[in-house]
C-alpha cells in the first residue's frame, strides 16, 4: 500500500480500488472492471483528505463511471510521464501509437514535462485494449509556468502533421486548459479546476482564477 499522504494528479492511473468502494447501484460492467484488476483514472475533483476522485472505464465510450477511493488502498500508480516510451513491439500498432512516436521529438524539444493520457495511456499502462483505428492521441503537458499563446499556436501547428488527431491539455497548478483554445490569438479560455470550470483570460493569473 502507498502512504495516504502521497499526491496524485489528474490522469494518473491507480491500482487497488476495492469492490467495497463502489456504491450498490454501480453497473455490472464497473464491478467486472475491478474484478479484472483494471486500473482507475484520477479525476479532477476536490475530495476529503485521504480520498481521491477516480473514473472507471469499460469497453465502450459510453461506459464511464465516476467514483472515489481511499489512497491507502492504492498499491500501484502510473503517471502520464512514465508512458512516453511507446514500445515498437506493441501488439497492435494503432495510429495513436504511431503518432506518439512521431511527435515525441516535438514534445521533448519543449523542455517541459509531458506524458500520455486517454485511451493510449490506459492501454500502454495496463496492456488492456482501449485503442482503435479512430482513436485520438491525448497528451498532457505540465505548464506550472506560463506558456505563451504564440508557443501554443506553434505547437498546434507542429502536431498537425501527425498521423492522427493529437489533443493536448496544459496542466497548470490550478487546473487544465486545452492547448487549442489557448493557441487562439485572444479571448477567454475554459480552465478546468477541482471545484469546477470557468472562463478566464489568463489561466496563470492566480488573482483572476481565485476571484
Curated annotation (Swiss-Prot):
Catalyzed reactions per annotation: apo-[malonate decarboxylase ACP] + 2'-(5''-triphospho-alpha-D-ribosyl)-3'-dephospho-CoA = holo-[malonate decarboxylase ACP] + diphosphate
Keyword set, alphabetical order: Nucleotidyltransferase, Transferase
Function: Transfers 2'-(5-triphosphoribosyl)-3'-dephosphocoenzyme-A to the apo-[acyl-carrier-protein] of the malonate decarboxylase to yield holo-[acyl-carrier-protein].
Hydrolase among keywords: no
UniProt GO MF annotations: nucleotidyltransferase activity
Enzyme type, top EC level: transferase
EC number: 2.7.7.66
A matching Pfam family: MdcG
Designated name of the protein: Phosphoribosyl-dephospho-CoA transferase
Active-site residue list: 136, 138
UniProt-listed NCBIfam families: malonate_mdcG, PRK01293.1
UniProt similarity note: Belongs to the MdcG family.
Top-rank lineage group of the source organism: Bacteria
Amino acid at each position: 500500500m502507498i502512504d495516504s499522504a502521497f499526491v496524485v494528479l489528474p490522469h494518473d492511473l491507480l491500482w487497488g480500488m476495492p469492490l467495497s468502494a463502489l456504491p450498490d447501484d454501480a453497473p455490472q460492467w464497473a464491478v467486472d472492471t475491478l474484478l479484472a484488476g483494471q486500473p482507475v483514472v484520477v479525476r479532477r475533483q476536490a475530495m476529503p483528505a485521504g480520498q481521491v476522485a477516480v473514473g472507471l472505464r469499460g469497453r465502450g465510450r459510453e461506459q464511464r463511471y465516476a467514483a472515489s477511493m481511499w489512497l491507502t488502498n492504492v498499491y500501484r500508480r502510473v503517471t502520464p510521464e512514465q508512458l512516453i516510451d511507446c514500445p515498437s513491439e506493441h501488439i497492435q500498432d494503432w495510429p495513436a501509437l504511431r503518432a506518439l512516436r512521431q511527435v515525441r521529438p516535438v514534445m521533448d524539444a519543449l523542455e517541459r514535462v509531458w506524458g500520455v493520457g486517454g485511451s493510449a495511456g490506459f492501454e500502454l499502462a495496463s496492456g488492456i485494449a482501449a485503442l482503435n483505428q479512430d482513436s485520438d492521441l491525448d497528451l498532457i503537458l505540465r505548464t506550472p509556468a506560463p506558456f505563451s499563446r504564440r508557443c501554443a499556436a506553434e505547437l498546434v501547428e507542429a502536431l498537425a502533421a501527425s498521423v492522427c488527431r493529437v489533443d493536448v491539455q496544459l496542466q497548470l497548478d490550478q487546473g487544465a486548459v486545452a492547448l487549442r483554445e489557448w493557441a487562439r490569438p485572444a479571448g477567454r479560455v475554459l480552465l478546468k479546476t477541482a471545484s469546477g470550470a470557468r472562463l478566464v483570460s489568463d489561466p496563470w493569473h492566480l488573482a483572476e482564477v481565485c476571484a
